[in-house]
Amino acid sequence: MKIAVDAMGGDFAPLEIVKGIEIARDRYDDIDFQLYGTASEVKPLVTNWERIELIPTTEVIEMGDEPVKAMRRKKDSSMVRAALAVKEGHADALFSAGNTGALLSSAIFLVGRIKGVDRPALATALPSFEGEHDQFVFMDLGANADSKPAHLYQYGILGSFYASHVLGIQSPTVRLLNNGAEEDKGDEVHKVAHQLMKNAPSFNFLGNIEARELLEGTADVVVADGFSGNAALKATEGTALMMLKQIKAAIMDSGTRGKMGGALLKPAFKSIQKKLDYNEAGGAVILGVKAPVVKTHGSAKATAVANTMGQIKTMIDQHLVSDIQNYIDTHTEELQAGKEALNAQINA
């Protein structure tokens, strides 16, 4: 398999990108890597060229660039060239730590949507602290600020496939992020989406979930509109990290006995911190496009890059994209019936 890598995307590119790719190359013997980037910057960083190819580019999409304009105008950028390699069949997957909006645009307009998917979505695996499984899928994280009920329904399908194929969860359960657990909670979009998902034969829907319950493990897939999902993700991550910081500060200020107790608890704190560390978790996936497209945090280091390569490898090995396409192709009538029922409900 071949992975097209945007070597210039990210706060620490190209150094940490190249370091991560070399770690992954040594870890996985069946992956070839295509590094797209500025030759004078990338070439000196590679210590071993085994299964690594450099494709020189002359432009870089910066973090502050307007996504669609950058994709269209910077045709020789590392990100666009890597996306085109996937589109043209020269690579099997696309990786970047760069501009999220530009990567979304490249994934949708260059790699292309899976036929039958209305809107691709951004998904990630978050830690589950009390559930049956260690992780759950959370989507959409901001690919679509506003979503229709039919989009949320499709996210349930896409998220279920990711949970089963990549996380190895059998018969994953699905919940809808809302401002209350009751069926009649939320705005009209979420009320209608709840009814559509409730009657869905495509996945195992358990109802609504509130943001405070996200990490409790009550669902294997949590579906949200992009605005709510992005806000909930950042609030959850920020709160968790701040709590760990405050606990550590309280221990340090509690005298000798407190510090001794803190030393005993150190392994537990490290375990929790590791679960929350994006460098360990891998990247966010753009689900609903014709090939694996994965984005790591902009400040990701080599460890995150290497771990994300393993994540992409699993997606390819488990035929995630082709299985989604096959499911949609063979359930066209079911999906269309759901949309028609939705339209009838809206117009009633």
Swiss-Prot record:
Pathway: Lipid metabolism; phospholipid metabolism. Homodimer. Probably interacts with PlsY. One of its GO terms (cellular component) is cytoplasm. The keyword Zinc does not apply. GO terms for biological process: fatty acid biosynthetic process; phospholipid biosynthetic process. Catalyzes the reversible formation of acyl-phosphate (acyl-PO(4)) from acyl-[acyl-carrier-protein] (acyl-ACP). This enzyme utilizes acyl-ACP as fatty acyl donor, but not acyl-CoA. This is Phosphate acyltransferase. Its EC number is 2.3.1.274. It is found in: Cytoplasm. The gene is plsX. It catalyses: a fatty acyl-[ACP] + phosphate = an acyl phosphate + holo-[ACP]. Keywords: Cytoplasm, Lipid biosynthesis, Lipid metabolism, Phospholipid biosynthesis, Phospholipid metabolism, Transferase. One of its GO terms (molecular function) is phosphate:acyl-[acyl carrier protein] acyltransferase activity. The lineage of its organism: Bacteria, Bacillati, Bacillota, Bacilli, Lactobacillales. It is an enzyme of class 2 (transferase). Pfam families: FA_synthesis (PF02504). It comes from Leuconostoc citreum (strain KM20). Belongs to the PlsX family.
